Regions:
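Extended, highly charged
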Residues: 1-239, 244-254, 258-263
């Protein structure tokens, strides 16, 4: 993330923003105006950043391209011929005693179910298959969330674990280079690891083994949440989705948080 902030304009928002609607208001006010915004959310010891990919030129900078065509071709190439990242030793991390209450979950719209992490990247490895995907998390308390998991590759790994009476170990990262977000939002075939896709997009990527599960997580991730995508289910939603309407309430897997680490 930090290396990306060095190549774009950054606007620092003063003060501390309330989780209830103020984060949403500020993000909306600055959307499409150019800068990435950096701000502090109440209860969080770290800065947060938003509007990293709200304009096309930021996507170009993140991918190192100069046009839509170059972006498409680079993403397609990375999905078809991903590259293994370099494995390094784990950095010094600080355990967040407040758990999920120390990460920048916020409420964006009045009828939403509660505080949300809107774009957390879940990394899971099971049965020799690794996956990284973006999922929203409804924060219930410092050790519990509910995760919207669409029926794709993470769901497949979850069902495999569940069929054996197991919870799925997951490492959830927040605050990464936007090229990693692009890779996590892509759709390679099952078995292609999106972190490898990100490594190809960036030319190289450094990862380390997460402290609890040993999952490969990108070096420099601002937050690493070690948890279990459990067999327990709970209501998730409503939540305003990408088309601006309230997504319906569903029973979804409960995230049981084991540890939260901050850079």
């Amino acid at each position: 993330m930090l290396e990306f902030l060095d190549v774009v304009d950054v606007e620092r928002i003063g003060g501390t923003l309330s989780r209830d609607f103020e984060v949403a208001r500020v993000v909306r006010e600055w959307q499409g105006r150019g800068p990435v915004i950096v701000y502090r959310v109440e209860g969080c010891p770290q800065d947060s950043a938003s509007n990293l990919l709200d304009l096309k030129f930021k996507l170009y900078k993140a991918l190192g391209v100069g046009s839509d065509e170059e972006a498409y071709l680079k993403i397609l190439d990375a999905m078809s011929s991903p590259a293994r990242p370099s494995v390094v030793g784990a950095p010094r991390l600080r355990e967040a005693e407040g758990g999920l209450m120390e990460v920048p979950a916020a409420r964006f719209y009045e009828k939403e179910a509660g505080l949300y992490l809107s774009s957390a990247i879940f990394i899971a490895c099971y049965d020799g298959v690794c996956n990284a995907s973006i999922n929203r998390v409804l924060v219930k308390d410092k050790r519990v969330g509910v995760v919207r998991v669409v029926p794709r590759h993470l769901w497949e790994l979850y069902l495999r674990a569940k069929s054996r009476g197991q919870d799925l170990p997951v490492s959830v990262v927040i605050g990464v280079h936007p090229a990693i977000m692009v890779a996590a939002a892509s759709s390679p075939r099952f078995g292609v690891f999106e972190v490898d896709v990100a490594s190809k997009l960036l030319g190289n990527l450094w990862v380390y083994e997460s402290p609890v599960h040993g999952n490969p997580v990108p070096l420099g991730s601002a937050v690493v949440i070690e948890g279990l995508l459990s067999r327990d289910m709970a209501e998730e939603g409503p939540y305003v989705d990408v088309i601006g309407t309230y997504d319906r309430v569903r029973n979804q897997p409960v995230l049981k948080v084991l540890k939260v680490y901050l850079m």
